[in-house]
Amino acid sequence: SVVLLYSAHSLPMSVVNRGDPYPAEVAATVWAVQQRLGHKNPYRLCWQSQVGPSAWLGAQTSDTVKNLVKKGQKDLVLIPISFTSDHIETLFEIDQEVIHEANELGADGRVKRAESLNGSTVFIQGLADIAKAHLDSGEPCSRQMGLRCPGCTSERCLESKKFFLGQKERTNDAVTL
């Protein structure tokens, strides 16, 4: 059976260890997609685009593909879950590097990448619906935006959160003028 590999952009562990919600948010997205698909295929969430010598969130997409192919699992579909359009991390990193390495290990062209959303009319309509619902709510941002990562010490992060949360007062002031 085909194994689905959801590939998302990785984060340095220093960011993850401060409590950044991104890994949980990506995992929740993967779970929602799997629910929609009826859990018909086995799957894994893996991470790509690590740079530099520091520790990053793993397992790496390239390592996951190599290890599965070496174990005989050659039918893989890579799903760039955190990439909504084609760019260097899909067209080069996945298509050229990861899939090429898999074929060198004997995958025989059976490792594929799901098409990115790009200009899909369904995707664009979905974004428009989300934007409209947000605008109709009158809220400047989601409540989640105001919650700092538990270990965050970045003043820039704090100031951006204060800015977005302060937009409600500015919006209310503008409405009452």
Regions found by a protein language model. Name each.
Residues 1-177:
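Active-site-proximal alpha-helix that buttresses catalytic centers in soluble enzyme cores
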